[in-house]
UniProtKB/Swiss-Prot annotation:
Main location: cytoplasm
Protein name according to UniProt: Tyrosine-protein phosphatase RLPH2
EC number assigned by the record: 3.1.3.48
Entry's Gene Ontology molecular function annotations: metal ion binding; protein tyrosine phosphatase activity
Source species of the chain: Arabidopsis thaliana (Mouse-ear cress)
InterPro entries reported for this sequence: Calcineurin-like_PHP_ApaH, Metallo-depent_PP-like, RLPH
Length: 309
C-alpha cells in the first residue's frame, strides 16, 4: 500500500494578531485528521510582527509550538517586517563580503528625511531596514493601504507597544526577551522540500517545494537566488525575495516545467495559480482573515471559519 503523503500546512502573514492565530490553529486542528495534523510540516510564511497589537504574544505562541507538538516540523520564514525588526535589534549576521551594515543606507539615502530613519542609540551600525523600521515617517496616512501609519513605514509602533515601550525607543533592545531574539535570529530566508505532494487536475503530483516570503525573481537564475537566501546575504539594501512585488509574483520561467511549487505570503492576496501559491489574505488589516493552505489538498483554512468546537 502506498504511503500516505505528509500533510504540509503553510500559514500566511500574522502581523501581530494573536486572536486570529489562535483561532486559525484551532481550525486547522479541527479540519485535519488528528494523526496527519500531529505529524505535519508547518511552514510559517513570515511577517509575525507590526500592524496588529500583540506581536509579543504571537512570538510566544510560535516559540511554544515545538514543545506542544513535538512530532510536527516547524519552519519559520523571515518576512520583510521580521527582517527589519531583527535589523533594529542588531541580530542580523555581518555581510560576508566584508562590508558594513551601514553601507546599505547609500542606495536609498534620498528617502531618509521623508521616512524619518531612526537616529537613536545603535543606529551607526544598523541595516537600512532596521533604521526604516524604527523611524518616524513624516506622512500620517498610507494612501496605498488606506490606513494611518503606525509610527514608521513598517507600522512598527504596535510592535514596540506590545513590549511595553514607545515607538522608536532604544529601550526595545532590552525589552525583547532572549528567547524572542533567538527566534528572530534563527528564522530562515528560504525553505526547500524535495518531495511534497499536491493535488492537480492530472491527479496527485510529487513536487519540490520552495517557500520564501515574497517570492523568487522571474528573470534571474534560481540557484543563484537560493544561494543568496541560504547564506542570508545582509549586504543587500532591499532583499527582493522578502519585499518585492510584481518582480517576484510569478514562478521563474526555468521552474515552469520542473514540478516546483513556490509558496509565499507578503502580497496581501490569496492567489492560487497552478504551482504558484500566495497565502496572505489578511495583509495585516484588522478586518481581514489570516489564512493557511493545506497540502496535498490545497484546502484553504481561515481564522474566521466556524470549525472548532
Amino acid at each position: 500500500m502506498a504511503q500516505k503523503p505528509r500533510t504540509v500546512i503553510c500559514v500566511g502573514d500574522i502581523h501581530g494578531y494573536i486572536s486570529k492565530l489562535n483561532n486559525l490553529w484551532l481550525n486547522l486542528q479541527s479540519a485535519i485528521d488528528p494523526s496527519d495534523f500531529s505529524s505535519a510540516l508547518v511552514i510559517f510564511l513570515g511577517d509575525y510582527c507590526d500592524r496588529g497589537p500583540e506581536t509579543r504574544k504571537v512570538i510566544d505562541f510560535l516559540i511554544s509550538l515545538p514543545e506542544k507538538h513535538p512530532d510536527q516540523t516547524h519552519v519559520f520564514l523571515a518576512g520583510n517586517h521580521d527582517f527589519a525588526f531583527s535589523g533594529f535589534l542588531g541580530l542580523l549576521p555581518r555581510p560576508s563580503d566584508g562590508s558594513d551594515l551601514k553601507d546599505t543606507w547609500k542606495e536609498y539615502s534620498k528617502s531618509e528625511e521623508t521616512e524619518g530613519w531612526y537616529t537613536g542609540e545603535g543606529f551607526e551600525d544598523m541595516h537600512l531596514q532596521g533604521r526604516r523600521w524604527a523611524g518616524k515617517i513624516k506622512a500620517t496616512f498610507n494612501s496605498v493601504k488606506g490606513m494611518a501609519y503606525k509610527g514608521s513605514i513598517y507600522d512598527a509602533g504596535s510592535t514596540f507597544e506590545s513590549y511595553g515601550v514607545p515607538h522608536g525607543s532604544s529601550d526595545l533592545m532590552k525589552a525583547v526577551p532572549e528567547s524572542h531574539k533567538k527566534f528572530l535570529t534563527n528564522m530562515v530566508w528560504v525553505h526547500e522540500e524535495d518531495d511534497v505532494c499536491i493535488e492537480t487536475e492530472e491527479g496527485l503530483k510529487h513536487c519540490k517545494l520552495i517557500a520564501v516570503h515574497a517570492g523568487l525573481e522571474k528573470g534571474n537564475n534560481v540557484e543563484e537566488q537560493l544561494k543568496l537566501l541560504r547564506a542570508k546575504d545582509t549586504s543587500i539594501s532591499k532583499i527582493q525575495h522578502l519585499s518585492g512585488r510584481k518582480n517576484v509574483w510569478d514562478i521563474p520561467q526555468e521552474l515552469d516545467d520542473k514540478h516546483t511549487v513556490v509558496v509565499s505570503g507578503h502580497h496581501g492576496k490569496l492567489h492560487i495559480d497552478g504551482m504558484r501559491l500566495i497565502i496572505d489574505e489578511g495583509g495585516g488589516f484588522p478586518d481581514k482573515p489570516v489564512a493557511a493552505i493545506v497540502l496535498p489538498s490545497k484546502k484553504i483554512i481561515r481564522d474566521t471559519d466556524n470549525l472548532s468546537s
